[in-house]
């Protein structure tokens, strides 16, 4: 697991430090704050991020019509190589940057499968910046979470790496 974290940390352009642990509720197992969110998958079903507890989680906002879109290939390669060691990649489609993700969730899923064979987890398309950004991205970009990484993300394929133990 340490090798996995070192390889990923060195390979990523931007990453976040591990999130502090907080209790879900009194007496419950501790779950890192970054996993205290529920979102929807591309299929519309609820995804409770706490299911990734104990994993290395790489959260990436993605878009299918961006100059960085070929990063899907590298993300899939990381998934193929390290998923068995506890790596989870969460793709989070967003249309916030240059309207480069105009498709529906179904179109995004088809694009990712056809062009990159994406098998890692993909969440539904959501806002990741501005006043209407989803709570997960509110947390990831919050000054209270880590002042070094606070503020709006700059573009598609911004990465947050956390050890969710």
Residue positions per predicted region:
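Thiol/selenol-based redox catalytic cores and closely related redox-interacting motifs
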Residues: 117-165
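Thiol-based oxidoreductase modules, predominantly thioredoxin-like and allied folds used
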Residues: 86-103, 119-130
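Positively charged n-region of N-terminal signal peptides that target proteins for export
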Residues: 1-3
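N-terminal "domain-start" segment that seeds a small globular fold
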Residues: 22-50, 135
């Amino acid at each position: 697991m340490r090798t996995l974290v070192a390889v990923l940390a060195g390979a990523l352009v931007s990453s976040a430090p591990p999130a502090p642990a907080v209790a879900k509720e009194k007496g419950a197992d501790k779950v890192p704050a970054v996993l205290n969110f529920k979102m929807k998958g591309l299929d519309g079903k609820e995804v409770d991020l706490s299911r990734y507890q104990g994993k290395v989680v790489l959260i990436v906002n993605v878009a299918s019509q961006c100059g960085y879109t070929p990063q899907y290939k590298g993300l899939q390669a990381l998934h193929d190589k390290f998923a068995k060691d506890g790596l989870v990649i969460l793709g989070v489609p967003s249309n916030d940057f240059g309207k480069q993700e105009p498709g529906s969730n179904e179109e995004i899923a088809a694009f990712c499968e056809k062009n990159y064979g994406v098998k890692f987890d993909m969440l539904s398309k959501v806002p990741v910046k501005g006043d209407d950004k989803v709570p997960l991205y509110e947390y990831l970009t919050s000054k209270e979470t880590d002042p070094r990484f606070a503020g709006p993300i700059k573009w598609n394929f911004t990465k947050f790496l956390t050890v969710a133990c």
